[in-house]
From Swiss-Prot:
Binding site for S-adenosyl-L-methionine: Y40, G65, C66, S67, D90, N91, D122, I123, N137, R204
Keywords: S-adenosyl-L-methionine, Transferase
Function comment: Catalyzes the conversion of S-adenosyl-L-methionine (SAM) to carboxy-S-adenosyl-L-methionine (Cx-SAM).
Gene3D superfamilies named in the record: Vaccinia Virus protein VP39 (3.40.50.150)
Example of a GO MF term: S-adenosyl-L-methionine binding
Gene source species: Azotobacter vinelandii (strain DJ / ATCC BAA-1303)
Record-given protein name: Carboxy-S-adenosyl-L-methionine synthase
Record's keyword annotation contains Disulfide bond: no
UniProt similarity note: Belongs to the class I-like SAM-binding methyltransferase superfamily. Cx-SAM synthase family.
Length: 247
């Protein structure tokens, strides 16, 4: 499928609105996230690889905050356990509509993929069924901080023995020098990918009120408080990381 280049913040805006996963963002999202999140393609593809180690036959695999379904597609490519199915959940109608188009395109190119169900829902209100794998790829950071432990508790409760949560997030750092250095390097990554200073500044203004990153230690302690017994970081590139949490 074709997507448009991300030029959402290329012109000066009199007032920068809060970032939202609307039709404008859905249209450019593949370009936006590839140019904004270092290591994103590696994270997505390897979530599929890792998921294959935890998926159990006849169980659900959740992609919570699925956006355009990149993780769902990776799960379908890599998980071969018989009877598994992917549940892709997002609360944005615009994102989910395009997600369905991408999944349909995947179906037309490959045979014997896992079945996938798309669900428009708020994951905070979603009744999670038993699952062997839950993936949240840059989703928790958009959940109100006071609701994050509650959500992780629900996920922990839903996971079957031998299952796992794979959680990817942007990080902040308690050490000011480390936080500043990795922040500056992330800006350099964006510039190298063609974003102007205006685009970077306006995107930051749009997203700073809706995305609240945590530190790696905050993630670890919250996951343990939610009932997970082990938290293992498996990937980090600059200030973006992915963790495996075992129930």
């Amino acid at each position: 499928m074709k997507h448009s280049p991300d030029r959402l913040f290329a012109r000066p805006l009199a007032e920068v609105p809060d970032f939202a996963f609307n039709e404008d963002v859905a249209r450019v999202f593949p370009d936006m996230i590839k140019r904004s999140v270092p290591g994103y393609p590696t994270i997505v593809e390897n979530i599929g690889v890792l998921a294959a180690q935890f998926a159990r036959p006849g169980t659900r695999l959740y992609d919570l905050g699925c956006s355009l379904g990149a993780v769902s597609q990776a799960l379908r490519r890599h998980v071969k356990s018989e009877g598994c199915r992917v549940i892709a959940v997002d609360n944005s109608p615009a994102m989910l509509e395009r997600c369905r188009e991408y999944l349909h395109a995947q179906d037309s190119m490959f045979q014997e993929l896992l079945p996938v169900e798309t669900v428009e829902a708020d994951i905070l209100a979603l009744a999670l069924e038993p699952a062997s794998l839950v993936a949240m790829n840059f989703t928790l950071q958009f959940i109100p901080p006071e609701r994050r432990l509650e959500l992780l508790g629900h996920i922990h409760h839903s996971l079957l023995p031998g299952g796992a949560l794979i959680l990817s997030e942007k990080l902040r750092f308690s050490d000011a020098e480390e936080h500043g250095l990795l922040g500056d390097l992330h800006l350099a990554f964006k510039r190298a990918n063609g974003y102007s200073e205006l685009e970077i500044a306006q995107k930051r203004s749009a997203i700073e009120n809706v995305m609240k990153p945590d530190s790696l230690e905050e993630h670890r302690q919250r996951l343990l408080a939610a009932g997970f017994r082990k938290v293992v970081p498996w990937f980090q590139c600059l200030n973006f990381a992915s963790l495996i949490a075992l129930p």
